[in-house]
């Protein structure tokens, strides 16, 4: 219908403009156009393009009507040809899509299609040959073929492991990894508590016995029996310890009557004797406490941990004893000499027993802890927590920390004791670093 309307419009326009043209000429032109359309249809359809016809159709002639019918028939033939040509194209598109879908689906590769990602020059055929040469009888017996360094994962050959690493045992790990030592046995919680109470009872028994011997046992025994004449040795009592410390630290205490200890309460002497006797019992019983603690933990310790424990604890006790002696011979005499020097001109020196012994015992205990600095530094370096160079680079920070602790914890508000203690801590720290540098650690 669209072709008929288009033909009608074209014929009307041609009638107005070309009315004088010859009818035969128009028919010959129509035949030429039909021949051109036939040739264009034989060449192939042109999609998306409409080619106008130049022929003019009239209604007054049968020849013209037959020409129009022939033209319409040719147009319909062209349309059918174009539809016929489009069908194979659609078939080709569907075939292409099906091929693309089939390429996306996984499929098994043939033997000749397998490729290797190993770079050239890195693959050794000798490994395949050695694998082919494996004795099947040896494989059946469970023996594995010897592996070379190249066959090992990561390229590490077993022969490259040092003898020290080969002798390494899980027990030497130190409890950080691996299983528990063989001596560790499962025990119920009540059994652990009973063992702990039993070992603590031993420690308390030893410390209590020493305390009772010093006070009041020694005083009673010395009053009843002349121990010097009977046993050849004088048993020291708490009173003897108090007199020794007082005469050693207070300047002129033996010659100046006013510098004898003053009592400002009815229980000061008794409490001071108990304090001194208890401190002596604790100090003497401390090795027993360390030994019982080691026996309690020994089943769960690795050999390396036992070695560290047995090396560190006696060293700590020795350092604590050195700190107490340093306080007794250096720190306390200097402090009390300073106290008496600036009070002699204005007042009578009369120290109370309780406050004086509190200061003495606190400073002795403080110096016992301060002298653990070399042990702490050594253990930190041995455990790879820090290095000597790291400590040396931050020495000013440690100096400030030492002085801050000395001024905060010291019982002396005048600043004399904190300065001595801070200088001692810095000296111990620097001396430890110097010793490590000298030994090459």
Curated annotation (Swiss-Prot):
The keyword Transport applies. The keyword Membrane applies. Pfam families: TatC. GO terms for molecular function: proton motive force dependent protein transmembrane transporter activity. It is found in: Cell membrane. Residues 1-185 are annotated as: Disordered. One of its GO terms (cellular component) is TAT protein transport complex. Keywords: Cell membrane, Membrane, Protein transport, Translocation, Transmembrane, Transmembrane helix, Transport. One of its GO terms (biological process) is intracellular protein transmembrane transport. It is a multi-pass membrane protein. Residues 51-62, 105-117 have a biased composition (Basic and acidic residues). The chain crosses the membrane at residues 200-220, 276-296, 317-337, 357-377, 395-415, 416-436. HAMAP family: TatC. Belongs to the TatC family. Part of the twin-arginine translocation (Tat) system that transports large folded proteins containing a characteristic twin-arginine motif in their signal peptide across membranes. Forms a complex with TatA. This is Sec-independent protein translocase protein TatCo. It comes from Haloferax volcanii (strain ATCC 29605 / DSM 3757 / JCM 8879 / NBRC 14742 / NCIMB 2012 / VKM B-1768 / DS2) (Halobacterium volcanii). The lineage of its organism: Archaea, Methanobacteriati, Methanobacteriota, Stenosarchaea group, Halobacteria. The gene is tatCo.
């Amino acid at each position: 219908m669209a072709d008929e309307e288009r033909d009608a419009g074209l014929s009307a326009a041609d009638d107005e403009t070309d009315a004088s043209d010859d009818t035969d000429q128009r028919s010959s032109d129509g035949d030429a156009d039909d021949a051109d359309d036939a040739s264009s249809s034989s060449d192939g359809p042109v999609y998306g393009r409409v080619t106008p016809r130049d022929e003019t159709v009239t209604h007054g002639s049968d020849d013209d009507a037959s020409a129009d019918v022939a033209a319409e028939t040719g147009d319909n033939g062209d349309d059918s040809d174009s539809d016929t040509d489009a069908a194979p194209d659609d078939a080709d598109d569907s075939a292409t899509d099906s091929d693309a879908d089939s390429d996306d689906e996984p499929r098994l590769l043939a033997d000749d299609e397998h490729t290797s990602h190993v770079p050239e020059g890195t693959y050794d055929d000798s490994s395949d040959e050695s694998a082919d040469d494996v004795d099947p009888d040896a494989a059946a017996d469970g023996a594995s073929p010897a592996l070379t360094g190249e066959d090992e994962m990561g390229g590490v050959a077993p022969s490259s492991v040092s003898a020290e690493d080969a002798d390494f045992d899980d027990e030497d790990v130190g409890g950080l990894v691996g299983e528990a030592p063989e001596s560790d046995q499962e025990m119920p919680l009540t059994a652990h508590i009973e063992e702990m109470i039993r070992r603590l009872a031993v420690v308390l028994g030893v410390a209590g016995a020493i305390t009772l011997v010093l006070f009041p046992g020694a005083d009673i025994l010395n009053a009843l029996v002349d121990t010097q004449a009977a046993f050849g040795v004088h048993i020291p009592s708490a009173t003897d310890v108090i007199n020794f410390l007082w005469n050693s630290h207070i300047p002129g205490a033996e010659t100046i009557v006013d510098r004898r200890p003053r009592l400002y309460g009815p229980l000061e002497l008794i409490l001071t004797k108990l304090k001194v006797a208890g401190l002596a019992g604790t100090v003497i019983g401390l090795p027993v406490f360390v030994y019982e603690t080691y026996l309690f933990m020994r089943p769960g310790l690795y050999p390396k941990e036992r070695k560290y424990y047995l090396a560190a604890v006696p060293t700590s006790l020795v350092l604590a004893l050195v700190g107490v002696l340093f306080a007794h011979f250096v720190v306390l005499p200097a402090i009390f000499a300073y106290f008496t020097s600036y009070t002699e001109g204005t007042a009578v020196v009369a120290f109370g027993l309780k406050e004086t012994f509190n200061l003495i015992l606190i400073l002795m205990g403080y110096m016992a802890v301060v002298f653990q600095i070399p042990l702490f530094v050594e253990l930190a370096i041995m455990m790879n927590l820090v290095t000597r160079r790291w400590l040396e680079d931050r020495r000013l920070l440690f100096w400030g920390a030492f002085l801050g602790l000395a001024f905060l914890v010291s019982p002396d508000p005048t600043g004399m004791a904190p300065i001595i203690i801070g200088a001692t801590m810095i000296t111990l720290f620097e001396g430890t670093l110097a010793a490590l540098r000298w030994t090459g650690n």
